[in-house]
Swiss-Prot record:
The lineage of its organism: Bacteria, Bacillati, Cyanobacteriota, Cyanophyceae, Synechococcales. Belongs to the bacterial ribosomal protein bL20 family. SUPFAM superfamilies: Ribosomal protein L20. One of its GO terms (molecular function) is structural constituent of ribosome. The gene is rplT. One of its GO terms (biological process) is translation. The keyword Ribonucleoprotein applies. This is Large ribosomal subunit protein bL20. Keywords: Ribonucleoprotein, Ribosomal protein, RNA-binding, rRNA-binding. Signal peptide: none annotated. Binds directly to 23S ribosomal RNA and is necessary for the in vitro assembly process of the 50S ribosomal subunit. It is not involved in the protein synthesizing functions of that subunit. One of its GO terms (cellular component) is ribonucleoprotein complex. It comes from the Bacteria.
Amino acid sequence: MARVKRGNVARKRRNKILRLARGFQGSNGSLFRTANQRVMKALCNAYRDRRRRKRDFRRLWIARINAAARINGVSYSRLIGDLKKADVRINRKMLAQLAVMDPKSFTSVVTSAKS
C-alpha cells in the first residue's frame, strides 16, 4: 500500500483550529494541541451558553417586572395573572423594558390589568 502524506489536509485542519483559537492567551492560541483542547471547550461552552442565555434573560426580565410591580403595590405573579385575565397580550421582555424605560406606561399597564 502506498504511503499517504497528509500535507494539505492536515495543514488545513490545523490552521482552521489555530484560526478559531486566535486571541486565546499564551500557548492556547499558538500551539496546536493545546489550542485544539481550548477550542473544543470553547465550542462546548458556547453551545451550552446559547441555551442558558435564554433562561438568564427571562430571569432578568422577571426580576425587573417584579421590582416595578411591587412599587405599584402588586406582586409579579398577581400582575401576570391579572394581565392574562384582562387579555393584555404583552410579553415579559416588553414589560421589563416598559418598567425600566417608561415607568408611567408600566403603571398604566398595571392599572389596566387590575380593573
